[in-house]
């Protein structure tokens, strides 16, 4: 492999779906293999996505650093990089196979719009955990579909981070009370704007939306994602490009 996803920023407008398809496919297959062994990967991030042929019609992707895998059901609050951490891990439920699936949605979001998740735009005024969690809440949580908070038995640090993140979501800027400190949009708003401006192919947005389900009970497994209409559409778009 020649490089990593960390070193290959998306070029917006995103005119090719081939690299997106390669990353999604490699990640999902890695998650399926881990799940068959009762393991979770826990460490999907751009530097662990190995790439080759990125300038050609059929780029290849492979997931590296597989040695960090652990048994499914790890009850550890700090698993997964903060930018790509699943809601149930933030809530101290546990880290399961579907937590890996969430991390792929977050990874693709981060690749397409660097800073929409994670700590990139934090000026240091807030702890990274609080900043990352608040952005996750702004992107995906609603009044009727919130991120489940940690239980009373979770670590006090996590409980406090969750409470402070909730406050940060609606906190106004000191220099302009009409503006939020966080300018992160909701995912649907972001995706609609990206599609309307012809910045991101619909098949890529649909794939992310299919994976990024807050409730893990309703989130697809990696195996289900590989046979989904969303992945088939992404695959077909990439195949069409390679022929062209």
What annotation goes with each model-predicted range?
Residues 80-93:
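Protein kinase subdomain VIII
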Residues 35-52:
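Catalytic-loop of the protein kinase fold
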Residues 47-83:
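Activation segment/activation loop of eukaryotic-type protein kinase catalytic domains
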Residues 140-207:
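C-terminal lobe substrate-recognition/regulatory segment of protein kinase catalytic domains
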